[in-house]
Amino acid sequence: MIKILIRAGITLVFCVLGAFVFAFFSPRPPLTIDPETLAGDGSSINYCELPELNGNGRFAKDIPKGNTPGCAYDHFPLPVLRDCTEPLPDGASDIRGLWIGTSGHIGHLERVEQCGARVVVTSSGIIHDAGPNSTGGLNSNDTEGGVLFTIGDKEYCPRTSASVTWNKGVLDFHVFGWGPLVVNRYPDGEELIWEYADGSTTRMERLCELPAEYKKPKPRGKRISFFPS
């Protein structure tokens, strides 16, 4: 019995260590976001004027996947799908826009883009993009954004990956595409509801303009420093 417990303990340690190494030290996904999108100023847009999804322009599959440079962008970028006009699929709710939390995670701000079956969420320094695109992979393949530690000048934040599927008007996010459900988003009247993996439920209201204090993301994470330069 003792040997079994020891073996189980050793196996658990190696599993945790392997997950940690994968999350923090595996190669970062290549930066595939359009450089003009990343360099542009997302604070200059009226987010109450939503693009018309009439199918007369580009489709989701024609646009490169958006993702986060390093552990966070340095300013709020332009919308990834600003030139996309593909209609939403059957069963999808229209939750596009700029939203801010009024209960739960009060002050949380995010931009939700949709075009066809594709969804992009930009918030707190990160860009999560899932669905058809021109550079590969339906799941988001990105970082969580919170910097756990630094080695010298290099920041280390955990990798994340999730799929998005519509379930009776509710947008479900599953870890790696096959894992557990970790996030939901869905409309409730004029509000957007965000149910997160920590068990919280955040109600958000629509904004037309990005508040000035959200243009540059605040540093996140413990930022434990090793071998500072």
Which role fits each region the language model picked out?
Residues 157-189:
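Acidic, glycine-rich flexible loop segments
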Residues 59, 105-159:
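N-terminal glycine/threonine-rich, aromatic-flanked beta-hairpin/loop signature
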Residues 191-199:
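Short, exposed beta-strand-loop hairpins at the edges of beta-sheets
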Residues 103-105, 123-125, 175-177, 198, ...:
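A mature extracytoplasmic/lumenal domain signature
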Residues 2-107, 207-229:
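Amphipathic/hydrophobic helical signal segments and adjacent flexible N-terminal regions
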Residues 156-165, 198, 217-228:
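Short, surface-exposed secondary-structure junctions/capping segments
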Residues 106-110, 127, 160-162, 179-184, ...:
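A structural detector for short beta-strand units
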